[in-house]
From Swiss-Prot:
Top-level taxon: Bacteria
Keywords (A to Z) from UniProt: Plasmid
InterPro entries assigned: AriR (IPR024753)
GO BP, one annotated term: cellular response to acidic pH
Pfam families cross-referenced by the UniProt entry: YmgB
Gene source species: Shigella flexneri
Protein known as: Uncharacterized 9.1 kDa protein in spaS 3'region
Amino acid sequence: MCYMGVNFCNKIGIDQSEFEIESSIINSIANEVLNPISFLSNKDIINVLLRKISSECDLVRKDIYRCALELVVEKTPDDL
């Protein structure tokens, strides 16, 4: 199943008021990925977050990316 639209967090049930920063990052990545391919899956978001975690030098930002990754993995089934 793929998600169309830019509010990926809403689609997978992340409480955006509780995870404001992480939701913003996830939705921003969704917008980046969605433009060229028109469909968006949880694996697209996971791949981008993994790349951002591995390339980020700022430990605070890296931790935010890690939290965002945990949210996506927790809220989505394996086969989306």
